[in-house]
């Protein structure tokens, strides 16, 4: 049996564009994509921290070091410029793979440069 686990995420990126009439997708700065391990055209989940909306689309590569996070097509109704978002992908892993898997986590600064990276999420305390 396979388990679906978090493969990677870009945490607290800021939406720079919302292009309703652009052909679907979400353009992501290529540097962020590479660090997170997101492939072009890969399915992504976008969780809007600002308004609580969640949607699924696919990633396209934005210009390296541009800071672009552009929500395109119909998904542009789900995010406004300036919104904080989390962009995540998931993968299916065998039991052996799941036992050793560590996600790739990229934490963004407000200008969508990299603050830091990690491979585990801190324990949440009460």
UniProtKB/Swiss-Prot annotation:
Keyword Hydrolase assigned: no
Annotated catalysed reactions: L-aspartate + H(+) = beta-alanine + CO2
Xref: CDD domains: Asp_decarbox
GO cellular component: cytosol
Cofactor(s) listed in the protein's UniProt record: pyruvate
UniProt name for this protein: Aspartate 1-decarboxylase
Role summary: Catalyzes the pyruvoyl-dependent decarboxylation of aspartate to produce beta-alanine.
